[in-house]
Amino acid sequence: HVLYHPCINLDDLSDTDKSTVDTMLGGQTPQEYLVSVLLGVIQSAIKPHHECVKLCLSHTDSYAFSALLGQNELEEVNPAMGVRGVSRFVSDFYKDAFDVECQIVKRLRSSGYDIELVIPFVRTLSDGASIIDKLAEKGLPRGLDKFKVHFSCDMPSSVLLVDKLLHYFDGVVVNLDSLGEFTFAIDRTNEQLSGQLDLQNEALIILIERVIAETNKVNKPCLIKMAALKPYPKLQSLFVESKGLKIAISE
């Protein structure tokens, strides 16, 4: 739907690219167009039976953004471990794009949707505090009109800090595929290594059990998000035995 970078500067484009983007925008600003397109995509995915919608902010890395028109991303040797998630949201470079994401959340909420926000790549406690403050600055203070903000466990540090991070957030979403990659330092897109990424390995199960235990202690929700569950009987057993756990499968 969108071919250009969310922080695009039209003056930096070639005449050909500028003409392409201008045609796409139809008189709107780049940010206005992004909001309208992404709102349409999100609203089309929301079904009448969805009482509550968890919406995750962008977890895209610089490698993916670098494929877009008007990008001005700094080249990173390892984008997956680079500027993404909270470190991107709080940066001056990404402020226009973060504003777009916040506008979308506010528009959805003002339209009557019960939106609960999920923050990806919360690496540290300071990340947690920073993003809550940043959301408040954008008119999305946690707790106002029952607005809930969750954080995503994408790497082991967020699991190790889960009890403290829960002071800042209303719940946890465990991105199991991402957590597995960062736990074992395996790129699942690498054909030579992908077979070694076992999501029911004992190390990962220990991390999952910690998140479940800590959320139960404070009576806050835990959602496990993963691409597929069928190949993992150990995880199936763990999830069945776990109190109050919810599972989201994207297969």
Q: What is the role of each PLM region?
A:
Residues 1-251:
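Non-catalytic helical/linker scaffolds that mediate oligomerization, partner binding
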